[in-house]
């Protein structure tokens, strides 16, 4: 199969998982616990561009110990899901937006951009050989797709590499919340920041996530599930929650208003975030993208003005927030249960992804 100037070759796994093995894994897939039988690999070399597009058996890769990615972290990645609909078709949600964001991240890390058409074709190629790994319709299970690009050129000089590799791997993913949506408690980090103006916060870059691990551990030590990030300059303004964007609901019912931090260059432009903003507008809610500081959050939560808070991202879709710890203080969001607006938006978004709600924005695309 060709995509632009690239032709994909397929080398099938000699010993793929048996039907019984795969079905056992799909019953309790977890997240990132199992992987499909194959992966996509595409090479890049300066002067030649992207080439050698292949579907190959999933397995270890060979990398020179001095590969630039191992020393200077020159890599970017994406995350999206493939869903099986009731008619048997396999679809993706806004994969074109993931392709565009991967290019944007690559530009920020001085990595060659992978053309959108090649990105989309890589998804189709992997689904074609591993379609049996996509969980059945009707539940919240899906096949998680992880595309990433990393510098493979050996060398210890601090400079952009001239050789790269694109890989696409896939992992069946179970429902994020078992037994119902579980609100989380969050720890507001005042010592650490996720990103700063002019930095890499808007890129989906592994270094951002590595730098968040210490603060996440601090949150756990303080009895919280997730960390909330403040801005790097004033340490006042809410930016993100863990690796997710965050929303505040003011008021209730049809007059509810949604507020989310504006994209300042230090926030990841989440695809779920963008989708929820559109769905909120469709539902008749007022939406604002603006700065909101920790004092406003605490005061308006205490006054009952902020009635719901949730974070959003590919893995969990929407995660409600029940309790907030900030230094020595602690406060709750309303009654600590998932709110009406939160659940309505979640139901609409997951309904579109599952094919049970109308896709009025043309977000779903067939992969197989």
From Swiss-Prot:
Q: Where would one find the signal peptide in this protein?
A: none
| Leading EC class | transferase
Superkingdom is Bacteria
Q: How does it assemble?
A: Homodimer.
What Gene Ontology terms for biological process does this UniProt record contain? branched-chain amino acid biosynthetic process; branched-chain amino acid metabolic process; isoleucine biosynthetic process; L-leucine biosynthetic process; L-methionine salvage; L-valine biosynthetic process; protein-pyridoxal-5-phosphate linkage via peptidyl-N6-pyridoxal phosphate-L-lysine
InterPro entries per the record?
Answer: Aminotrans_IV (IPR001544), Aminotrans_IV_CS (IPR018300), Aminotransferase-like (IPR036038), B_amino_transII (IPR005786), BCAT-like_C (IPR043132), BCAT-like_N (IPR043131), BCAT_family (IPR033939)
Q: Which reaction does it catalyse?
A: L-leucine + 2-oxoglutarate = 4-methyl-2-oxopentanoate + L-glutamate; L-isoleucine + 2-oxoglutarate = (S)-3-methyl-2-oxopentanoate + L-glutamate; L-valine + 2-oxoglutarate = 3-methyl-2-oxobutanoate + L-glutamate
Q: Name one GO molecular function term.
A: L-valine-2-oxoglutarate transaminase activity
Protein activity control: Inhibited by ammonium sulfate at millimolar concentrations and by O-benzylhydroxylamine (Obe).
Its name, as the record gives it, is Branched-chain-amino-acid aminotransferase
Q: Spell out the family assignment given in the record's similarity comment.
A: Belongs to the class-IV pyridoxal-phosphate-dependent aminotransferase family.
Pathway listed for it? Amino-acid biosynthesis; L-isoleucine biosynthesis; L-isoleucine from 2-oxobutanoate: step 4/4; Amino-acid biosynthesis; L-leucine biosynthesis; L-leucine from 3-methyl-2-oxobutanoate: step 4/4; Amino-acid biosynthesis; L-valine biosynthesis; L-valine from pyruvate: step 4/4
- State the organism named in the record: Mycobacterium tuberculosis (strain ATCC 25618 / H37Rv)
* Binding of pyridoxal 5'-phosphate, residues: 101, 209, 271-272, 314
- Family matches, as Gene3D superfamilies: 3.30.470.10, D-amino Acid Aminotransferase, subunit A, domain 2 (3.20.10.10)
Instruction: Say if the entry is tagged with keyword Transferase.
Output: yes
Q: Which PROSITE patterns match?
A: AA_TRANSFER_CLASS_4
Q: What is its EC number?
A: 2.6.1.42
Job of this protein: Catalyzes the reversible transfers of an amino group from glutamate to the alpha-ketoacid of the respective amino acid in the final step in the biosynthesis of branchedchain amino acids. The amino acids can be ranked in the following order with respect to their efficiency as amino donor: Leu > Ile > Val.
Cofactor(s) recorded in Swiss-Prot or TrEMBL = pyridoxal 5'-phosphate
Report the residues modified as N6-(pyridoxal phosphate)lysine. 204
